[in-house]
Amino acid sequence: MKIKRIFAGLAAFTVSVLVMTGCAPGSADIVAGSSISVAWNQAFYSNNPATSNGNATANANITYLTSGAFNYYDAVPKLIKEERFGKYEVLSQDPLSIKYTVNEGVKWSDGAAVDGADMLLAWVANSCVYNNVSAEYDADGNISNQAALDAGVFFDSASCGGDLGKVTQVPVIGDGGRSVTLVYDQPIVDWEVNFGIGVPAHVTTQHAFAGENLSAADAKAKLIKAIQDKDLATLAPISKFWSAGFDMVDFPTDDPSLVVSNGAYVITDLVKDQYVTLTANKNYTWGPSTKIETITIRFIEDPLAAVQALSNGEVDIISPQATADIITALNDVASKGIVTNTTSDSTYEHIDLTFNNKGPFDPASYGGDADKAKMVRQAFLKTIPRKDILTKLIQPINPAAQLDDSQTILPGAAGYAEVVAVNGSAEYANVDIAGAKDLLAKAGVKGKVAVKFLFGCGNTRRQNEFALIQASAAEAGFDVQNKCNDDWGSLLGSGTYDAVVFGWQSTSLAVTSSKATFASDGGNNLNGYKNTAVDEAYAALSSEFDTAKQLELLKTIEKNLFADAYGVTIFQFPGVTAYNKNKISGIVPAPLAPMFFWNFWEWKQEGEIIKG
C-alpha cells in the first residue's frame, strides 16, 4: 500500500528506529534458534522507502527493522529520542540550526561507519535542492525523457517539495565526520521529524561509479566533495542509483551490499512475492537488544488467507485489511490462542481524481476549459456512495465508525470538527445523482463518461467498494471501468488511470504531513493537482507555531481542495492485529506506521525453540 502519507521521507527516517528502557543494547538477549513469522498484505520491493516509488508501508516496515535512527514513535503515540544511536540539538532559533551527531561505533553491517557522508546524502536526496530535471510521462505512463534524467541530477524522493528543501546551504560536517548541522532558511514547525539517515552513502556512490572500484572511505569522500562543490556531473549517477538502485524483489545474491544495514536486523533472504527473511545483526550495540534471532515476513494479500495461515501456525502475527468476514474468522479461531486487537489506525481511505492525463477530469480534454473539467469532477464525486461503503463494509466491524470528511485531519483529532464545518465536504455527504446529471449537462458532456478506476485486485474490501461506486456512478452516466492491478502502487502518478482508491497512512504527528500530497511540487502529489492558494497556505503552515493559526491555514487548504473537486475521503481504517499468544508475546499495536512493528525488540517467542 502506498502510504504513506508514509509521507515525504518519514518512512525512512522517523519511523526507522528502536529503543528499550532498562536493557543493555547488543546481541546478548538474542535467543539462539528463535524465529517468528509475520504476514503482510503487500510484497517488499524496495530497500529505499524514501523514493517516490519505494514510499510504501510494505517497504518501510522492513527498513524499520534494519535501520537505526535519531527518534521513533511509541504506541501513544509519543516521539521518543534514541540517544544510543545519536543526538540532535538546536544550536540557534534564528536561523533555525539543528546539529545531528551519530555516536561513535555506530556502523553499517559491512563495517563502514555511519557518519556525515550518510547524512549529507540524506539531505541532498530528500531536499531535492540540486535536482535540475524531473520525470515526464507519455500517455501509457512510461517515462518519456529518460536521457535527460540520466544526464541530470534527479533524486526521485517522496520528500521533494517538503520542508527539508528549506535547507539550501550545504550542511557543515563536524565532530570528526560524525555530525552535520542543518541551517533552515526559515523557521520550520515540524523540524524534529524532518531528517534522518537512509541508505548508505558509500554503497550508493560505489555503485554509481562501479568502474572505479572505490573503497568505502574513498566513496564517502567522493560524495562529500561532489555535494560541497555542487558537482552536478558527479551527482547525476549518484542520484540515479539512489532513486532506483535499491529496488529489489529477489535477494541480490551477487551484490549483498544492497542490503547493508545499520539497525537491529539484516535482510538475509528475499523471494519474489513470497517472503523476506531478517536475521539479527549481532554487531548491533546502538539500540535496544532484540530477542528474536530470525523474523520472516510472508506476503499474503488475501485477508482470509492470512487468517488461515495464522490458524494453521504458518504465521504468528497478521494485520489484514478488516472486513466483517475477517473478524468472524478470527473469532472462530480464538480457541487456538489467537488474540485479536481492533482499533482505528492512522490510515484513511480516499478517492483521488487525476488532473493531468487528458482524461475526463483534465481540462486538456475540454480545450483547456478548467471550469468544465471541474464540473465533471464534481459530478463524479457526487455519485460516490460514501455512506453505503461505510455502513456495508466498515460499520459491521466497527459500529462507531463515521465518515471521514477531512483531507488533512483524522476524525476525533483536534481541529477536525472545526475544519469539516467549513471545508465544503458537505457537498458530497450524500449521493446526488440528479445533481451529477445537471453538472454534466452544464459541462456540455454527452454520452457515457469513461472513468478508468485503479485499485488493488486482491483486496476484497476495495473490490466491494469499486462495485458500489461503479453501480452508483452509472446512474449519472459514468462508465466506471475496472482497471485493478496487483502492482497498483507502482502505477500511482503514472497518469494511466482517472480515479484511484487507496489509503494514506501517517508516520508522524507533523502538522504539515499532508503537504507532500497536496502541494504542487509535493513528492506525494500523484495526480497533477496545482493550486497557488494551497501552496501559499502550506508555505505559511511550515513556519507557523500558533495552533489556532495552523487551524485557519488548514481550513484554507481544505476549502480549496473541495472547491476544486480534488477527491473525497471515506473512512478511517479499522485496524486489526491478530497473533498467536502461544507462540509470541509483546505485541502492542500502534496507530502510526510502522504499527505493531514499532516495539519489535520487546517481542518474545513463546513455546519450544528448536536450535539449529
Walk through the language-model features, giving the residues of each:
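Aromatic- and charge-enriched surface segment that lines or borders ligand/interaction sites
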Residues: 88-150, 175-186, 190-192, 306-309, ...
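Alpha-helical secondary-structure segments
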Residues: 112-124, 177-181, 264, 344-405, ...
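Periplasmic binding protein-like
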Residues: 38, 111, 311, 322, ...
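N-terminal lobe/hinge region of extracytoplasmic solute-binding protein
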Residues: 39-93, 101
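Structural transition elements
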Residues: 397-442, 457-462
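Ligand-site clamp/hinge motif
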Residues: 125, 253-256, 283-329
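Surface-exposed binding/hinge segments that line
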Residues: 138-242
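Extracytoplasmic/peripheral linker and loop segments enriched in polar/acidic and small residues
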Residues: 378, 382, 390, 424-429, ...
